Amino acid sequence: MTPKVTIYTDGACKGNPGPGGWGAILFYGDKKKEICGGEPGTTNNRMELMAAIQALELLNRPCVVELHTDSQYVMKGIQEWIRGWKARGWKTADKSPVKNDDLWKRLDAARARHDVDWRWVKGHAGHPLNERADALANEGLRQANPRVI
């Protein structure tokens, strides 16, 4: 039987660009795992992508995944834009290079191992698991830049 995993992700950035963090909560049966990390110089979109990447890469075998994100950038990118980008050799419709293509390629590879149901959740709307993912992203931001309070 294929394992079922529920994931909540979020990214945070102090300045854009600036120090940033990502966080994710993974649920598998009655088990819960929280992860976070950060980078000293990044963007909010890169941190949103990293949260999903890190969570999916943590899974050591193919799973049925329900992944929740409050990022329209991640949702539209993975569900709509990525097919065109790949078909055009990682160029946008106007022939510009895709921003963050290194992370989009990594996310594409990470999701290929799993059956992922992408779910959008409204950010900062009081959803407890999204709020926890946000807190983890902010913890990752603090780890990347201890001077950020």
UniProtKB/Swiss-Prot annotation:
Its EC number is 3.1.26.4. It holds the Pfam family RNase_H. One of its GO terms (cellular component) is cytoplasm. It is found in: Cytoplasm. Mg(2+) 1 binds at D10, E48, D70. Mg(2+) 2 binds at D10, D134. Residues 1-142 form the RNase H type-1 domain. Its cofactor is Mg(2+). GO terms for molecular function: magnesium ion binding; nucleic acid binding; RNA-DNA hybrid ribonuclease activity. One of its GO terms (biological process) is DNA replication, removal of RNA primer. Endonuclease that specifically degrades the RNA of RNA-DNA hybrids. Monomer. This is Ribonuclease H. It comes from Caulobacter vibrioides (strain NA1000 / CB15N) (Caulobacter crescentus). The gene is rnhA.
